[in-house]
From Swiss-Prot:
It comes from Caenorhabditis elegans. Keywords: ATP synthesis, CF(0), Hydrogen ion transport, Ion transport, Membrane, Mitochondrion, Transport. It is found in: Mitochondrion membrane. Mitochondrial membrane ATP synthase (F(1)F(0) ATP synthase or Complex V) produces ATP from ADP in the presence of a proton gradient across the membrane which is generated by electron transport complexes of the respiratory chain. F-type ATPases consist of two structural domains, F(1) - containing the extramembraneous catalytic core, and F(0) - containing the membrane proton channel, linked together by a central stalk and a peripheral stalk. During catalysis, ATP synthesis in the catalytic domain of F(1) is coupled via a rotary mechanism of the central stalk subunits to proton translocation. The keyword Mitochondrion applies. Belongs to the ATPase g subunit family. One of its GO terms (cellular component) is non-motile cilium. InterPro entries: ATP_synth_F0_gsu_mt. GO terms for biological process: proton motive force-driven ATP synthesis. Subunit of the F-type ATPase which has 2 components, CF(1) - the catalytic core - and CF(0) - the membrane proton channel. GO terms for molecular function: proton transmembrane transporter activity. This is Probable ATP synthase subunit g 2, mitochondrial.
C-alpha cells in the first residue's frame, strides 16, 4: 500500500525538522569556529603589528601620490573600489550601531545651554531687523 501523499504544510514541517536536526548536530563545532574567529579578528592590533600597518599605509600613500592608480586595469580598479566602499559602508554601519539610531545622534532639548540659546535669539532678532 502506498504512503499517503503529504500536504504542503506537512512537507514544510518535515523539511524544517530535518534542517533543525542537522543544524543542532553542527552547532557546537560551528560555534567554536565562530568564537575563535571572533576572538582573533576583533582583537585590537598588538604592538608587533604596528610596523606592518605603518608600512602598508605608506604603500597606500605612495600609490596615491605617484598616481599608480592610473595604471590599474579596469578589473583591479573595480575590485579596489568595491573594497574601499565596503570599508566605508561598514564604518557607517558601525556608527549607526554605536549610536543606536539610524539618522543621527539623539540630542536632548536641554543639551544646549541657556547662554547659547540667548545668543541665538539675539542673532535671529538682528537678522530679522536687517531684512
Amino acid at each position: 500500500m502506498a504512503a499517503p501523499k503529504l500536504g504542503f504544510f506537512e512537507k514544510i514541517a518535515n523539511l524544517t525538522g530535518a534542517l533543525y536536526r542537522h543544524q543542532h548536530a553542527q552547532f557546537p563545532r560551528r560555534f567554536a569556529i565562530l568564537k575563535a574567529v571572533g576572538k582573533h579578528e576583533l582583537a585590537p592590533p598588538r604592538q608587533a603589528d604596528w610596523p606592518a600597518i605603518k608600512a602598508d599605509w605608506a604603500k597606500v600613500q605612495s600609490f596615491i601620490q605617484t598616481g599608480g592608480y592610473k595604471n590599474l586595469s579596469i578589473r583591479e580598479g573595480l575590485v579596489y573600489t568595491a573594497v574601499t566602499l565596503e570599508v566605508v559602508f561598514w564604518f557607517f554601519v558601525g556608527e549607526m550601531i554605536g549610536r543606536r539610531y539610524i539618522f543621527g545622534y539623539l540630542v536632548p532639548a536641554d543639551y544646549v545651554s541657556k547662554s547659547t540659546k540667548k545668543t541665538v535669539k539675539e542673532q535671529e532678532a538682528l537678522a530679522a531687523l536687517e531684512n
